């Protein structure tokens, strides 16, 4: 893969989830299949990501579109097991809200996460994932918090592994 540049796209920032793990490496590359410049991520047991903070009116713009290419599955991943939750790709949407209205347990979890990571957790999260076995469209609640939902956007070692796959989802409907 031909490296175009090592710096992140404008407005994108590293998001470190677990400081004890090696962060994912990101760079912009020219995809040899399409010739398009894309963001390439290389991770080895990482717990990090990239984020871009946006202020979007979900009633006016309820659709998100993206594409990704999955080269390999994480064989040990099982998103129905809290100790094996993992995905080779994720698109996470964070939502604002009044955290004081959440149950006390959720508030304590968010406070603890801030102590460990140095960052505030969002009020709610919708995570689009590639899952090993579950069918596309499956919604998985997080086993850690009721404020996170995972939606299977791609699944299994299907014929699309190694190929670009495009998605367009109404995230407002998906989160309900």
What are these regions (language model features)?
Residues 74-95, 102-104:
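Beta-strand acidic-aromatic groove motif in beta-rich domains, primarily in extracellular
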Residues 24-48:
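Short carbohydrate-recognition loop motifs
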Residues 39-61, 73-76, 145-155:
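Secreted extracellular polysaccharide-interacting domains
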Residues 86, 96-146:
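Extracellular/luminal beta-rich ligand-recognition
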Residues 51-53, 61-65, 86-91, 123-125, ...:
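Extracellular structured ligand-interaction cores
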Residues 67-73, 96-98, 172:
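Solvent-exposed strand-to-loop "edge" motifs in beta-rich extracellular domains
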Residues 1-20, 104-110:
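Extracellular carbohydrate-recognition regions
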């Amino acid at each position: 893969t031909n490296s175009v540049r090592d710096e992140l796209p404008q407005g994108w920032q590293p998001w470190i989830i677990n400081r004890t793990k090696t962060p994912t490496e990101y760079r912009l590359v020219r995809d040899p299949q399409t010739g398009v410049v894309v963001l390439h991520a290389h991770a080895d047991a990482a717990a990090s990501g990239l984020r871009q903070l946006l202020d979007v009116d979900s009633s006016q713009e309820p659709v998100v579109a993206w594409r990704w290419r999955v080269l390999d599955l994480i064989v040990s991943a099982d998103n129905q097991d809290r100790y094996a939750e993992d995905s080779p790709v994720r698109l996470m949407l964070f939502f604002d809200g009044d955290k004081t209205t959440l149950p006390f347990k959720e508030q304590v979890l968010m406070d603890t996460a801030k102590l460990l990571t140095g960052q505030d957790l969002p009020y709610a999260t919708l995570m689009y994932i590639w899952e090993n076995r579950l069918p596309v469209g499956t919604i998985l609640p997080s086993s850690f918090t009721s404020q996170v939902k995972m939606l299977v956007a791609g699944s299994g070692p299907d014929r699309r592994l190694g190929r670009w796959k495009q998605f367009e989802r109404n995230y407002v409907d998906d989160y309900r």
